[in-house]
Structures are given as structure tokens and as C-alpha cells.
């Protein structure tokens, strides 16, 4: 089991079903130490208002012994790599970004690859969400090389093997192998939209084992590894986690 989940949605994304408190209780029960709340960016049709992200500053850093990162799953908007993460949100700890049909309709490999690399190059994003989505094929080798260059983790998303983005597994396998060969970072995300799936990386673990991916390049191994990654990426130091 990994003690960190870096992709979680609450009822603020209205197609999800659990509250922050629900996730804290579930994390406590499962022995998860650190979670990132990453509700959908404001360009999604049922996303929270921008005030929701701004007001995350009132959240305690540690709740009942569980560390909470303030995050967003932003939307890649165009081929220039722009995302719906504005200067108003700059106090967030973790920025995930990915393609979603209602914001960036699927196009072709070249367009998707160019947009994803441009997003990474802008320097705001820590993790690219579900890059194995078959609706958005990319040049996997180029994406993995760029991710390593820009210190961006590529996500292995457990829900891509179950009910979302059907047909993702071949791409996800290729991404894991490409990140391994590029000496990049992988992030595991449950992409939970209900608390019961928090920390469920069952399918991710199977792929990691079968592709012989090194554990020292997986962010979720410990809270300390995630916090160190954030600090190295953009000098994000969270004093409340100094002794966490």
C-alpha cells in the first residue's frame, strides 16, 4: 500500500460524492498519511467556483493526523499549453493538469503532444493527469522525455483501468516504460470521486510490477518524497509539514 494519494475529488466537483471529512476518515482507516484534494478547474462545466480554490487557505494542514495538500486538476485549454489555473490560485500546493473533452475536444497526436509539452514547459504544473487516455493519443516517448526535463510527474491513474477512459492500459504500460527509461517521475492517482476508492492503486501496482518500474521514482512512496518533489520543483515549502 502507498501512503499518499495525489488525485482526489470532493463534492465541490459536483459529479463526485464525498466531502473532505469523508476522505479524512477513510484515510485514517486505511493508514494513508497524505492526500491531495484536486477538484476540477473552473473551465469544467460542473467545477467549483474560483473562490473555492482561493479559500482553501482556511483548511488545516493536518487533520486528525492526515496531511492535506491544497490542489487542483486544471484543464489544458489549447495547443499553447494554457490551463485554467490563474494567478489567483498561486497559493495552491499541487497543480495537476490534463485533457477533458468539454474543454479541449480530442484532435490528433501532434496537437495533443504539442499542447501537453507546452503545458509542462510553462512551469506551473506538477503532474499530468491520465496521459494514457486513448481519446488523446500522444507521442509517448516525447512526453516522457519532456516530463523528465521539466520535472513533471506523469500519472498512472487507477480509474483508467476500471470505469473511466476505457482502453487506456496499452498506453499506460507504454508510459510507465517510457518514464522508466527517461528516469522521470510517476505519480499514482486513485482519481477518487467517492471516498471508498481512496488509495486504491490495485491496477497501478500490477502494471508497475509487470513493467519493472523502480520504486525510487514513484512519488507516492512517502509524504516526505512528495514534499521534497514540491520543494525542488517550485520552492514550495510548507512549514506545518516540517515534522510530518
From Swiss-Prot:
NCBIfam families: PRK09248.1
Xref: InterPro entries: Phosphatase_YcdX_put, PHP_dom, PHP_phosphatase, Pol/His_phosphatase_N, Pol/histidinol_Pase-like
Biological processes, Gene Ontology terms: bacterial-type flagellum-dependent swarming motility
Transit peptide is among the record's keywords: no
Top-rank taxon, per record: Bacteria
PANTHER family: PHOSPHATASE YCDX-RELATED (PTHR36928:SF1)
The EC number(s) this enzyme carries: 3.1.3.-
Keyword annotations: Hydrolase, Metal-binding, Zinc
Protein name per Swiss-Prot or TrEMBL: Probable phosphatase BCI_0316
Amino acid at each position: 500500500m502507498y501512503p499518499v494519494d495525489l488525485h482526489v475529488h470532493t463534492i465541490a466537483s459536483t459529479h463526485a460524492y464525498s466531502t473532505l471529512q469523508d476522505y479524512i476518515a477513510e484515510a485514517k482507516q486505511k493508514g494513508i498519511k497524505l492526500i491531495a484534494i484536486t477538484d476540477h478547474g473552473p473551465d469544467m462545466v460542473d467545477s467549483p467556483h474560483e473562490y473555492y480554490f482561493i479559500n482553501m487557505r482556511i483548511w488545516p494542514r493536518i487533520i486528525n493526523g492526515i496531511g492535506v495538500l491544497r490542489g487542483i486538476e486544471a484543464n489544458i485549454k489549447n495547443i499553447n499549453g494554457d490551463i485554467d489555473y490563474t494567478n489567483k490560485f498561486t497559493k495552491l500546493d499541487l497543480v495537476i493538469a490534463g485533457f477533458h473533452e468539454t474543454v479541449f475536444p480530442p484532435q490528433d497526436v501532434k496537437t495533443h503532444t504539442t499542447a501537453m509539452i507546452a503545458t509542462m514547459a510553462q512551469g506551473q504544473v506538477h503532474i499530468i493527469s491520465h496521459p494514457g487516455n486513448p481519446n488523446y493519443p500522444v507521442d509517448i516517448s516525447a512526453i516522457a522525455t519532456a516530463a523528465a526535463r521539466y520535472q513533471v510527474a506523469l500519472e498512472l491513474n487507477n480509474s483508467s483501468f476500471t470505469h473511466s477512459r476505457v482502453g487506456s492500459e496499452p498506453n499506460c504500460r507504454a508510459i510507465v516504460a517510457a518514464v522508466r527509461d527517461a528516469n522521470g517521475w510517476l505519480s499514482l492517482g486513485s482519481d477518487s470521486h467517492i471516498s471508498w476508492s481512496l488509495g486504491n492503486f490495485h491496477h497501478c501496482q500490477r502494471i508497475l510490477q509487470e513493467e519493472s518500474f523502480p520504486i525510487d521514482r514513484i512519488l507516492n512512496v512517502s509524504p516526505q518524497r512528495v514534499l521534497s518533489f514540491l520543494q525542488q520543483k517550485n520552492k514550495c515549502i510548507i512549514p506545518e509539514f516540517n515534522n510530518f
